[in-house]
Amino acid sequence: EMLRSLVGSEMCIRDRIYQLNRDPRNFTVVMWLFIMMGVALVVYFNTSPSEPRERDYVYAGSFYAFSIWIGFGVLALRDLIVRIARRNGAWTAGVATLVCLAVPGILAAENWDDHDRSHRTMARDIGWNYLQSTLPNAIVLNYGDNDTFPLWFNQEVDDVRTDVRVMNTSYLGGEWYIDEMKTRANDAAPVPFTLPRSKYAFVNDMVRVIPKVERPVDIREAMDFFRSEDPRTKVPLVDGTTIDYLPAQRLALPVNKDNAIAAGIVKEEDRDLMVDTVYLNLRRGVLDKSELMVIDLLSNFDWKRPIHFTQVYILQNLGLTDYLQFDGYSYRLVPILTPYDRRVGEIGRIDPDVIYPLLMETFRYGNVSDPRVYVDNFIQYNLMASGAREAFARAAKAFLRRGGEGDRDKAVALLDAGLEKMPPAQIRYTFSNTFPFLEAYYAAGEMEKGDALLLSYAENLMQYLDYYLAFEGVQGDMVSGLIDDKLDELGQIYLLAGYAGRRDAVARLNDYYRTLGATDEDLLHVDAPGEPTDSLLPIP
């Protein structure tokens, strides 16, 4: 199989010699193209070992040179046939072409399955899911390429949710993009920025936060202060120039409850949950321009338009992560305080009635449940970053906590659907996308389903551990951190099995721990499971 994969390389090397013998001058040109667009670029760019995505397109020029040499293989074989047959004619070129077609045929046969994307639609579906999780006329703030381009594709090509305004915060450092956001796009209204161009065009790339006032300052007053040209609103620098700054670390964002309900940001029945004021905490002493523009947006939107975020990272420096609602993919800014609980590890509140139809009917997952679809590391990472599978478990837990009529059945349906749409055979186990399912299955009384998932996850962890433990010396040191991680995951589900009284699961894991040298004193007793920590409670 390896030899078949190297056919192209062997042909390239042989035909490189053929061109050198027949046409040295042009050989030099192609060789320089190969070197300068390949090895030289590797040295020049000094590319890091880990990249967010494949960067092989940088070396496309060297691929062209490689292909030129492979193409010379037809000429080389044709000359060989002429020498052997001692005849020259059109048939010699035909025979050479037919024989050489085996090269791309072999390469296709060996590599097609790894590169076939005919059934894979995950890149498009990520954008679909983000857009469908937003309210009408919303502004969705995103951060990177992976949560921007799929949304643009859905809007501009497939005409999906063109009422939503997509705003990439990493572009807000450019005055051209801010100007663009101030204009209408498709069916989406402009972003209600208020800062004049003189305050963001080629100035204020970084903005100081100097707390002249200890108390929280109304966000509108703070932006009026920043917008002012009064010399008293500036701070001098050592070179004599002055710069704008924000005068408070805590900003108060008043809540217009009627507007929030009218825009669909909060349900009428949740009116009493709303706070009167949302407080921003500017944790750093300096903001970049994108953060300044987000503050400007918040100071002026008056809760008339929903604001969604694809990543909570955008809000961490503004101290707003306690005012979010998770809608399956995006996070909605809501005037409801939901403090982050480290024991649970979930950011924001959740409305199970809102998220249930989205998860069960609306969202798409790129056909990853189809075994024909190759789920590469890039898809794995994006599903992990968006919390796609654990969203099902989180919604299930919300139903179980509420405990209303039919809520348990909905919870189980969510758990089953999450594993069906993104099966472990395709989407690899991680602690974050598996452990919540175990908690919820056991809390719902679905012990057999919980056991099956737990044992499958445990077997996967044990295979990793057996592989890592086979390394010794320096290599063993290199994987020691991975061993610790897998042991920690195994220990967590072991304690959960004990807490839930799953005797067969505990016994299976006890057997494995004994192979690692554990004694009976170190293990849970099957008939007397141990007590869990707070973090292991199925329903917090």
Regions found by a protein language model. Give the residues of each.
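ER/secretory pathway lumenal C-terminal domains and tails of membrane proteins involved
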Residues: E1-R4, S9-E10, R14-Y59, A65-N137, ...
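Residues that form or flank phosphate/diphosphate-binding pockets in enzymes
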Residues: F149
